A protein has these predicted regions:
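Fe(II)/2-oxoglutarate oxygenase catalytic core
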Residues: 1-156, 162-188
């Protein structure tokens, strides 16, 4: 690996971000679960958020193609890991009313025997003026990006799924993000 993360600042315009928020908000709500020991469970001490799944369908084809190309570019220049696909994006809402957050974690479930999450993606959909707190942060990382850049609306962050990260509690307003995991053969 050449680096621990990379980002594409303001890749999506504010109008594109608002369109994603509007369309994704119409999708059914799912439980925000976490992976522990090969199982999924709800744990509000670890994670408080509302999620909706965006499936890889013709309605969302342009978004998937766009993010797929960014991940391929990031992988080629920064990570060089073996990955194969991403089935769905997670549209996530963190709200002040329940102090939306996600404590330090990594996205790979090493207990799964066949496929591992290899590259993670986080897209900042909200205007940073619309909320306080809710910072996406890398932890246990040698070098971290400037928080101003990771809060910029439309920015796409790509990183290996074994990298620890968190979202601090939202203290005012609401933060929306799009999250994706590109899977592939087991980490070695």
């Amino acid at each position: 690996m050449v680096s621990e993360w990379c980002y594409f600042k303001q890749h999506f315009s504010p109008e594109q971000c608002q369109d994603i928020i509007r369309r994704a908000s119409l999708l059914p709500v799912s439980d925000a679960s976490i992976g522990k020991g090969g199982e999924f469970a709800k744990d509000e001490d670890t994670r408080r958020s509302i999620i909706r799944w965006i499936r890889r369908t013709s309605e969302w084809a342009d978004l998937f193609t766009d993010v797929d190309l960014l991940v391929a570019k990031a992988n080629s220049t920064h990570f060089q890991v073996a990955y194969q696909y991403c089935n769905a994006f997670q549209f996530t809402e963190y709200d002040e009313s329940y102090q939306g957050h996600y404590i330090e974690h990594m996205d790979t479930f090493l207990a799964f025997p066949n496929v591992h999450r290899k590259l993670s993606v986080s897209v900042q959909l909200s205007d940073p003026a619309d909320y306080s707190g809710g910072d996406f942060e890398f932890t246990k990382c040698g070098q971290v990006p400037n928080p101003i850049n990771t809060r910029t609306q439309g920015t796409v962050i790509v990183f290996p799924s074994i990298t620890y990260h968190k979202v601090t509690p939202v203290t005012k307003g609401k933060r929306y993000s799009l999250v994706a995991w590109y899977e592939g053969p087991q980490w070695r």
